[in-house]
Amino acid sequence: MKSGRYIGVMSGTSLDGVDVVMAVIDENMVAQQARYHHPMPQALRQQILAVCQGQSLTLSQLGQLDTRLGRLFAEAVLALLKQQGLSGEEITAIGCHGQTVWHEPQGEAPNTLQIGDNNQIAALTGITVVGDFRRRDMALGGQGAPLVPAFHHAVLMHPAERRMVLNIGGIANLSLLLPGRELRGFDTGPGNMLLDAWIWRQQGKAYDKDGAWGAGGQIVWPLLKQMLSDPYFALSAPKSTGREYFNLGWLEQQLHSFPGLPAQDVQATLTELTATTIAQQVLLSGGCDRLLVCGGGGKNQLLMTRLAAQLAGIEVTSTDKAGISGDDMEALAFAWLAWRTLSGLPGNLPSVTGARAASVIGAIYPANRSLPL
């Protein structure tokens, strides 16, 4: 087992910045030691959003975006090291998810694309990087996502309590940690993605702080009913989705039949959409004793209130109360996946992704010094 000090880097679908964590990891523990949030320049965020929403660009532009994002990830890692007074030689490896700009698990040639050049990160930090985690699972017939349920199982599984872990990033995904049952996990649908896109369009704000704007609106029930009829919500697991599907274009298509709605009412309805699609999947999966929430959506008080209202009898609380930071969950997961890759251990779960087999996942980008194998 390649135990040591690992760094995890995560830039999620919400595009609010780069989360970097450091943890000591071995077969018995994941002990977080530090965290750092690195802001994403607005121009870079807008470029990534444009790509995710299908705007055409040249191969040169895509290559430049890949390089710039890799440099940003390296800056974030170096800032964390400076904060902690550490050198790159004291880190075993970095696990970097990259920025998903396209995810297409269905069809004749399933594919997924994460950018943020890992070669840049390895060269600029002097630390071995493990990245490109999703495509091996996809090559084995899986969805390539979600990958975090394996980490949820490792750190949050309880021998008796029936738990589910809900990550609300741009997309919301659910991990079913039910004693005596096979581990399953899947994307329920939009998390913060449509909420963030709509408030950005209307007010130029990155997100609806505490859900305050949405709380002042009224739910438009006919619009909600129409949105809930989208075929994705009726799909059986394994399933995954992303910004290439649930985006402003999708929302505008939904709003076409409802001209002139107050913008605040649309926000309230989108909040209810996220709460309802999550709650439906929790209940369809048999319910649980405790729903542990992580990700930025857990800070949206309106969303949490609406979710709890639809899950009477289930304790809805943060993963912080179970000992794992809700803000850092995904970055920790990719640090842990890097440890598994360097230890020669499988990182995907066929029961979650639908892959034909479990496999070591991720590509290794050696540091300038020798590879730590």
Curated annotation (Swiss-Prot):
The gene is anmK. Catalyzes the specific phosphorylation of 1,6-anhydro-N-acetylmuramic acid (anhMurNAc) with the simultaneous cleavage of the 1,6-anhydro ring, generating MurNAc-6-P. Is required for the utilization of anhMurNAc either imported from the medium or derived from its own cell wall murein, and thus plays a role in cell wall recycling. Keywords: ATP-binding, Carbohydrate metabolism, Kinase, Nucleotide-binding, Transferase. It catalyses: 1,6-anhydro-N-acetyl-beta-muramate + ATP + H2O = N-acetyl-D-muramate 6-phosphate + ADP + H(+). One of its GO terms (molecular function) is kinase activity. GO terms for biological process: 1,6-anhydro-N-acetyl-beta-muramic acid catabolic process; amino sugar metabolic process; peptidoglycan turnover. CDD domains: ASKHA_NBD_ANMK. Pfam families: AnmK. Belongs to the anhydro-N-acetylmuramic acid kinase family. Pathway: Amino-sugar metabolism; 1,6-anhydro-N-acetylmuramate degradation; Cell wall biogenesis; peptidoglycan recycling. ATP binds at residues 12-19. Disulfide bonds: none annotated. This is Anhydro-N-acetylmuramic acid kinase. Its EC number is 2.7.1.170.
